[in-house]
Amino acid sequence: MNVSSIGLVYVTTLLGWNMIIIVKWKGSVSLAIKIFIDQGHNPTGYHNTGATGNGLLEQDITYQVGVYLANLLNNDPRFDARLSRPTPTTVLGTTNATSLAERVRMANEWPADYFISIHCNSNPNPSINGTEIYLYQFNTQAQWLAQRIMTGIVEMVGTKNNGIRLNPSLYVLRRTNMPSLLIELGYLTNSSDAQKLRDDQYQFAYGIYLGIMRYFGFA
């Protein structure tokens, strides 16, 4: 069954934006919105491991934030969330390139309605801090979702809002077939961000969840 056979398009306004959202129905039953959560990188000891800083490993933080987010979404019957790494030992691909390709393949073949990739940042300058969200293109559903997620994270965690940015070269943004975004939660190399990334992983997940809820007009 394809989405077009069950899709209902309507126009609504959320926080001043004119938006078109697809709400999926089968008969009189609303179908769950499918969100693919990509926890960036692979476990320690394998290819495509992440950044490090202040004793923290990116791949460990992204894994746990993703688990928290999936649990929040899957406890709401309006959503169906899947993880790229359902266990902390899950390894995707055999090289950096195939690791990224596997994440995209999983999302496209499901197929997901939205794709959210979770990462942590680093910088040689330890004073650089804050949250950033990357998109393939502006004036899209991904941008509107990203703005609400950014607001949610800043409210829940208190990181600096570094804005919504374009990076169409990112593989997971340019090869996915649905609205996609990549969140850099904060900088592992900044002491303040690192403390938040260590202690506030559930709050990061809840901020993302809150943004998703607001995007759909559920909160």
Model-found features: residue ranges?
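Extreme N-terminal basic, low-complexity initiation segments
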Residues: N2-L8
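Catalytic-core regions of hydrolytic enzymes
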Residues: W25-T131, L135-W144
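Sec-exported extracytoplasmic/periplasmic mature domains
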Residues: V67-R78, N108-A112, M150-G158, Y209, ...
